[in-house]
Regions:
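Long, amphipathic alpha-helical surface segments
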Residues: 1-19, 25-27, 34-36, 51, ...
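Alpha-helical segment that forms one wall of the substrate-binding/catalytic cleft
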Residues: 43-75, 83-90, 94-101
Length: 146
């Protein structure tokens, strides 16, 4: 998968911030949507504390590895899917995580059947779609164009 393309998408969808901030749920975050955990050196840092670009890139690369691993768990043939499908699924996984994306059973059936329109229809028929409409619209459009 083209990780540079995924990064560019996620910079649009998640934004990129070189400081610790609180996300919409109140969790400490930095970089490209990186959730700060107790394993991060930034754990306990105050909101507004600067994070350098190298650390943002390292956290993103670590997050990508985790996301791609989760994609392969959820979609056993993930690496065999068309690049654009991989990009859409990885973007959704980055946004929601495996527990939430695993609930998209109709989308998974569509992807497994290589029925991209059915997969897109299932993406639209979700609470996620209503929550992140602009992002979701872009991803649905991409899925339909495969």
């Amino acid at each position: 998968m083209d990780l540079q393309k995924l990064r560019k998408q996620l910079e649009i969808d998640e934004g990129v911030k070189y400081e610790v901030y609180k996300d919409h749920l109140g969790y400490s975050t930095f970089g490209i949507g990186h959730l700060v955990t107790s394993h991060d050196p930034e754990y306990g840092w105050s909101v507004g504390t600067d994070v350098d670009e190298d650390r943002v890139i390292a956290a993103f690369e670590q997050d990508c590895q985790s996301v791609l691993q989760d994609c392969s768990i959820l979609y056993e043939d993930f690496d065999d899917l068309p690049e654009e499908v991989q990009q859409v699924i990885a973007n959704m996984m980055f946004n929601m995580g495996r527990p939430r994306l695993s609930k998209f059973k109709g989308m998974k059936r569509g992807v497994d059947a290589r029925d991209w329109n059915a997969a897109a229809d299932e993406m639209v028929d979700s609470g996620w779609y209503r929550q992140v409409t602009n992002r979701a619209d872009r991803l649905v459009k991409r899925m339909r164009e495969i």
